[in-house]
């Protein structure tokens, strides 16, 4: 009986972490400064709502950043992006992220996945604002590649 209870407990935690996102449960309220405050039932829904709010504010900038982090900015702006695209290759961000991705905490990955769901849903609803179709769908690994580029440049 104790084993059954333990299994049910672990299963309930697992289901809570990997719960489905219901956009209807997410409320984005902006204060008088325009700062988004996201209200939702789960952390994943908050991450989804945060991504949506960020996209509402500066979807173009987000896309250009992720293009840079994934060695694709040159497709958008041409030779001016050669430096960023080179750095992405130089720091071997793709292989680094692929090699270390499995070491990340499952909860962190689930929040990254929820964030990407929010960005991808925004892109789907606003296809005319998508700069480079090959960037989509955005994945957690694409976000991490951009993060690695940011860290490299800032150090």
Model regions: which residues?
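Bacterial Sec-dependent N-terminal signal peptides
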Residues: 1-21
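Substrate-recognition/specificity elements adjacent to catalytic centers across diverse enzyme folds
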Residues: 22-155
